[in-house]
Amino acid sequence: MTFKNGILTLACVLFVGCASSSSQRAIDIANKDLLNSFNPYILAKTNETKDAVTYQSMPAGDVWPSIAPIGSALVVDVFKEINKVCNFKYSDLKETRMVYFDDKTSFSYEVWVFNDPLSGRDDKITAITVLLKPTPDIGGTDMDFRIPADCHAPKQTTFVFGK
């Protein structure tokens, strides 16, 4: 599911027959859909006043080291794949975030956040989903990515709910 589809889901939950659902429930449903589609962004509360609550698209997960160690062949391979589409350098990497890690299979759903002056976001970052699944039987790691269409994040989505 793309971020736009996640937002459409949120809009449907809010405006079509879910009058008894709170805005928090709608956000939770949208975030579940975003995470299930390995989106690099979720909707997070960024401000709250006595009158309103603001949610914006923010990188998913918690700041955490990647399972691809710095300087390893795996991190080199990840950057090769990202650079087939985009031109981010290792020095552009702001942080890695762990969304999910499976202890049994070592599958990881990570979000790599890059400083990006061409990002449409106010914070000038672009987040990319990096999915890594070790394949010990053949001695490698399967990789998959969720990269913005033009490599740079669009303006962040913002929702403001009145109290």
Summary of predicted features, one role per range:
Residues 1-7:
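Bacterial N-terminal signal peptides that target proteins for export
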Residues 12-13:
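Short, linear, compositionally biased motifs with a strong N-terminal bias
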Residues 16-17:
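C-terminal motif of bacterial Sec signal peptides marking the signal peptidase cleavage site
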Residues 21-163:
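Cysteine-centric segments in proteins
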